[in-house]
Amino acid sequence: MKKLGKLLLGLISLVATIAAAFLVWIQCSWDRDHDAHPTPQLKASTDPAVIKQGEYVVRALAHCGDCHSPKGSEGQASDAAPQMVGGRVFDVPVFGKFISPNITPEHATGVGAWTDEELARVLRTGVSRDGHMRPFMATIAPMADEDLVAVISYLRTLPGARGATVDDQPTLIGKFVIKGMEPDRRAAPPYVPAGGVSVERGRYLALGPANCAGCHSASSPQSGLLPEAPYLAGALEPMLDETDPSMEFAPPNLTPDKDTGHIYNWDEDGFVARFKAGRVYKGSHMPWESFGRMTEEDVRSIYRFLRALPPTHRELGPTRRPRGYAKPS
């Protein structure tokens, strides 16, 4: 018995030592340096047409203010210049708290001291100026060089304002996930300019700047939190209703599956009307205020792309339901 007791104590001690070593390893190495990752050689433009294009991408398609405004989408409801000073807190269960940064050209707390190339890198790959990963930025969809230059050009015209200086607060699990993340190496997609209605423009928007696939597809730490195929078949994990913690939202299946496709029975005019109608639930994660600024041509293009997708059968249940809802088997 004494030998067995010593053996058990030895095993417990070994496990504790390994666990402690693992914790120290994560704490000391989670914030990896990716500064060697290539920086896109892109420069901002002062061309008014390019700046106007950037304003449309920032304020409508890419819904940047949904994260980089303290009030999220609510702060983007007016036509006034957006207050991109950051400070919005994203409390992600299990993974920690993440605070959006100031992206105005203010030097002390914003991106005024950043080069155009550094801005291009964080927007395209998620690698920040200091070489470290910005987890949320690493998951935004890639956009063509033309739109990326336009975004940077527009951001340079915003009034500089002091903003958030609080660091992210990832949990140990969050640090472990961030440690495993790699810079986004997806190639920039071919540019499909605005003008007219087409499936090609809809594909570019839904998988690019508008990032429909980012919320309406499954993702996991194994995929680097990037969308997993089949794209746009709905998210497997719900999102909490920030205004009512007893409720949650399930980003629905947008493929044309006749049984589980959320918009299967919608016609094109109905799809456009829904975007014009705006927010129904205050706590919805859908950036209705920003998407309400999209041109009708772009909304119709997205609809036509969604209708051209292969149907995927994925039953997700109600889009808004009590927290912890049991999915149909």
Task: Indicate where each model-derived feature is located.
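The canonical Cys-X-X-Cys-His
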Residues: 54, 61-71, 151, 202-205, ...
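Extended surface/linker regions that mediate inter-domain or inter-protein docking
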Residues: 13-16, 20-23, 138-203, 301-305
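N-terminal type II signal-anchor transmembrane helix
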Residues: 1-33
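Small-residue-rich helix-loop
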Residues: 221-224
